[in-house]
Design a protein with these regions (language model features):
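Conserved beta-strand-loop-alpha-helix hinge in the C-terminal portion
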Residues: 133-143
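Internal alpha/beta core interface subdomains
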Residues: 117-120, 125-129, 133-134
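Flexible, glycine/small-residue-enriched loop-and-beta-strand segment within the central core
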Residues: 2-6, 16-28, 33-115, 140-142
């Protein structure tokens, strides 16, 4: 499992098991932690002091703020398919924006949305709509 040469890492980034991650063309801010069995795809930006726990998947088009905690097994999905537009080069992917200080519980699934700063996403939540700042959401769909 590779860390590609196009990955940009800020000072103090910690990847304790570099052979157990897939990182492609992403940008990791200062003091970011990436656990084992994580995949982070091209174009993803992760703000400083954020933590991505093991077995998580972060797809293209995701921007994560500073001091965000992503628990074990979180999946970011960048296409709802039902309302995506096909382009000449394939599907047009939608963005996901995660604000500073957000906490995302284990096994949550995050679709293309905006999650406001300091919000909490419960374990197992399926987030299909934007989350205002300072909110707590849980369930399927998350409310």
């Amino acid at each position: 499992m590779p860390i590609k040469s196009d990955v940009k890492k800020g000072k103090g980034v910690k990847i304790p098991f570099p052979k157990l991650v897939n990182l492609y063309g992403c940008r990791l801010g200062k003091q970011v932690f990436v656990g084992p069995f994580v995949e982070i795809q091209k174009g993803v930006v992760i703000g400083e002091k954020s933590r991505v726990s093991s077995h998580s998947f972060i797809c293209e088009g995701v921007e994560i703020g500073k001091e965000v905690f992503i628990a074990h097994g979180v999946m970011f999905i960048n296409d709802k398919f039902s309302d995506s537009k096909k382009t000449g080069r394939g599907w047009k992917l939608r963005k996901t924006i995660v604000g500073d200080g957000v906490r995302i519980g284990s096994n949550a699934t995050i679709f293309p949305v905006r999650i406001g700063k300091k919000s909490i996403i419960g374990a197992g939540a399926v987030v299909t709509k934007n989350v205002p700042p300072n909110s707590i959401v849980k369930g399927n769909p998350a409310k």
